Amino acid sequence: PRTLKMAGAVADGVFIRVGTHSSNILSSIKVIWEGAEEAGRDKKDVKLGIIFHTVLHDHIEQATLMAKSMAAGYFEYSPVLFENLGYEWNGPDPEELKANEDVWPDFHHSSDLVASGSIVNFISTEQARSFALVGGNDDISTQLLNVLYTAAENGIEFEHVVLHPIPNPPTPDEGPGSYLERVPREILPAVRNALSTSLG
């Protein structure tokens, strides 16, 4: 929170990455705006961006396991994001799990996110979906729209929305099944159309 408040006080723009749950998103923006106002700035002068871990995968069980690994990574580095939502960590300490199960370097960057997600399968699907967009193109479009609608209802407009691919795509990422082609073809048009219709 102190870093967010400081950013609100001095930055032209702030990117946040706090998962997909609106409570964590709204509380983070509130702190940024408080920092701006305490510094005598108009909060609207602070441009906002948001990053979502995005598991675009049509095999929902594997996608959910990868999302559980993402949730574990958030708990590992920012446990307050779990606490804010009333979530409990019902497993061993993340450092113990990483050491015993050979997760390297962490739950966000494991080379096998399905395997690392299986290690933290005590994380519920609800919890996993609070920290990542998960599923096929329709699932992700719906989840993203719900977040953006809630933000708009609270006076929040994001200048930039980044869908960070999970896992990292190969290089080069080419072809009709690639993340780089699927997102602009299957997700972004539907989201833009829905927003233009509902928000004018």
Predicted regions and their residues:
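Alpha-helical segments flanking ligand/cofactor-binding loops in enzyme cores
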Residues: L4-G8, L145
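An alpha-helical appendage that flanks or caps ligand/catalytic pockets
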Residues: I25-I156, L195-L199
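Short acidic active-site motifs
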Residues: R2-T3, H59
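Receiver (REC) domain switch/active-site residues of two-component response regulators
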Residues: D12-F15, E159
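Active-site beta-loop-alpha junctions enriched in small/polar residues
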Residues: P1, G19, I51-V55, I166-N168
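Residues at alpha-helix caps and immediate loop-helix transition turns in enzyme cores, especially N-
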Residues: V10, N24-S28, H59, G175-L180
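Glycine-rich, proline-tolerant flexible connector loops at the mouths of alpha/beta enzymes
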Residues: V18-S22, V161-L180
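Alpha-helix-loop-beta-strand connector modules within alpha/beta enzyme cores
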Residues: E181-L199
